[in-house]
């Protein structure tokens, strides 16, 4: 009977080399950054701040510090309303994204626009994002009392109603960490620019630190 010797050493070496290549490729795929589109107005755009101090760069840096591989795109337009956001949504999201942070409505409120219009426009935005299978983080805003209690209730409720209607992560109030101890009065001296409306770099940092965990949760949707 004739016996054959199977020389498996070179074969094993080849398999190991192939395995290393495959694992390296898989690691590269896992390392590909997820795209987050920050879609909003001047609060998103970084009005009045140095290029590295706005919401988008600070959020990107915070997420990277938590070990998240992400690319945060600045789709903020100063002065934008919910109607303006709806009008530009399709071309803004021409490229796919894993998560869209929706931060619109504050300019509608400043202009005294009907809260029902705010709700309708944001609903259409959320519908489009849902159709595109994009995860969302919806940021809420609170109306002022000087427009009357009814306006405030309707405006505040628009965001709450949307949050309850969609599979979204809801951050209830963009400025919630920038308020004084009463939770109502803005802490102007520490966290706001001279206009009293837009956060300074320290204010953005406080917002990002508080909102960051919500973003991480939304990325898991």
Predicted regions and their residues:
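Alpha-helical cap/lid subdomain in secreted, periplasmic
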Residues: 2-3, 68, 86-221
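Aromatic (phenylalanine/tyrosine) cluster motif
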Residues: 3-11
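Membrane-interface segments of envelope glycosyltransferases acting on lipid-linked substrates or membrane lipids
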Residues: 3-4, 20-23, 41
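Bacterial N-terminal signal peptides
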Residues: 13-25
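Serine-esterase "nucleophile elbow" of acetyl-processing enzymes
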Residues: 29-78, 88-96
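Short, small-residue-enriched loops and turns at beta-alpha junctions
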Residues: 46, 79-80, 177-181
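Acidic/histidine-rich helix-loop elements
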Residues: 48, 73-81, 109-113, 196
């Amino acid at each position: 009977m004739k016996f054959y010797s199977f020389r498996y050493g070179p074969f094993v070496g080849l398999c190991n080399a192939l395995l290393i290549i495959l694992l390296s490729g898989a690691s590269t795929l896992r390392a590909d950054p997820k795209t987050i589109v920050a879609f909003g107005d001047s609060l998103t755009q970084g009005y009045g701040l140095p290029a590295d101090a706005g919401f988008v760069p600070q959020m990107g840096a915070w997420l990277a510090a938590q070990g998240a591989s992400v690319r945060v795109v600045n789709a903020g337009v100063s002065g934008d309303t919910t109607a303006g956001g709806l009008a530009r949504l399709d071309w803004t999201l021409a490229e796919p994204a894993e998560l869209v942070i929706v931060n619109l409505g504050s300019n509608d409120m400043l202009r005294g626009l009907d809260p029902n219009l705010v709700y309708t426009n944001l609903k259409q935005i959320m519908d489009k994002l849902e159709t595109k299978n994009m995860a969302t983080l919806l940021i809420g805003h609170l109306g002022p009392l000087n427009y009357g209690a009814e306006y405030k209730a309707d405006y505040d409720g628009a965001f709450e109603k949307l949050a309850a209607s969609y599979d979204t992560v809801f951050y209830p109030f963009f400025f919630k960490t920038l308020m004084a101890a009463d939770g109502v009065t803005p802490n102007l001296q520490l966290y706001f620019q001279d206009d009293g409306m837009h956060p300074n770099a320290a204010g953005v940092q406080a917002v990002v630190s508080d909102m960051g965990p919500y973003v991480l949760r939304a990325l898991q949707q």
